[in-house]
A protein has these predicted regions:
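Surface-exposed interaction regions that form or flank ligand-binding interfaces
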Residues: 1-67, 76-79, 85, 90-93, ...
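Phosphate-centric recognition/catalysis
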Residues: 70
Length: 172
């Protein structure tokens, strides 16, 4: 698999210095560095499983915007936009609703990861159409978890959900 890493504030060897970690946290938010670590775990697994026919673009910034697409995977099955999460706990995904489940009660989460992954997929699809790239299957948005402490109960979610125990199966 060919990896194109466009992560901002990284050194030539791919590491992030302490100063750049602080800059990234201030510029992109507190979850920036944990998100990068989760992405790296996912990329390591995908790199072992996928062949040379795949290209992975990491943290691509779309032209004329500040939208950062975490992972774009291009290969024979098509184009997939992968949003990697490091959250833990028990969640429910029903259509476009995303929230925590505790004591049998559902509570909407402050950040809806399903909608975020879905919107990233739509943004990439629109971006590619403007660049005159057409794909028969379109762009598939995926929410991928690398944390085994995350449980998701799903009922027809708007994006494909891949839990940590199924990442290798997803890649094969």
């Amino acid at each position: 698999m060919r990896i194109i890493d466009k992560t901002p504030l990284t050194n030539e060897d791919g590491s992030i210095s302490f100063i750049n970690r602080i800059k990234g946290t201030l510029q992109y938010g507190f979850s920036w560095y944990p998100d990068l670590q989760a992405q790296q775990k996912a990329i390591d697994i995908l790199d072992r499983q996928l062949g040379k026919k795949f290209i992975l673009v990491r943290n691509h910034i779309l032209e004329n915007s500040k939208i950062i697409v975490p992972i774009i995977l291009i290969g024979p099955p098509g184009i997939q936009v992968i949003y990697v999460t490091h959250v833990q706990g028990s969640y429910r995904a029903k259509n476009d609703a995303w929230g925590t489940v505790s004591g049998g009660n559902f509570k909407d989460a402050s950040i809806n990861l399903l909608k975020r992954a879905h919107q990233l997929g739509k943004v990439v699809e629109i971006y590619l159409k403007k660049k005159s790239f057409e794909f028969p299957k379109g762009v598939e948005p995926i929410l991928l978890s690398v944390n085994p402490a995350l449980h998701i109960s799903s009922v027809r979610p708007i994006v494909r959900i891949v839990l940590s125990d199924a990442v290798e199966r997803f890649a094969s």
